[in-house]
Amino acid sequence: AREQRQPEASPALASEPSDNVLPLSESAHTILIGHGRVGSRISQRLQAEQMPLVIIEALHSLVEDLRESGLSVVHGNAASSQTLAQANIASARCLIVAIANSLEAGQIISHARAANPSLQILARAQADSEVDYLKTCSADLVVMGEREIARIMLARLGLPAD
């Protein structure tokens, strides 16, 4: 039977960190939410392609490491519209939500869409119910790892995914 996960509750938003003073000046950039297993792979490729990138990350120790490596990073919870504004969401061209918490991802997507209606929004999901939820929050594309694995394996056998 297919597991049907429900979106997880989001922790209360912490107060905004004090190391974000002025909004970033980047424009036509990609904003990446989360620099974990998925986000770090995306970040590496965007850097290799020299695409303008701003990362929003909640873990302070990771923020410091990313900044030391020369990346543009906003420290905070991206579910806060203030944190998104700090990353200059209004001038971004794409938002990639690479975090696993689908409820928080939905909040991020809703705030981002309100701030920038033409933004391309890509999101990660871990279950069918999360795919549906994130699409209702106005994500343009929602990718579920298990579906993609199955699709690629079937394609390797010359079979369509459906």
Q: Residue locations for each model-derived region?
A:
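Cytosolic regulatory regions of ion transport systems
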Residues: 1-162
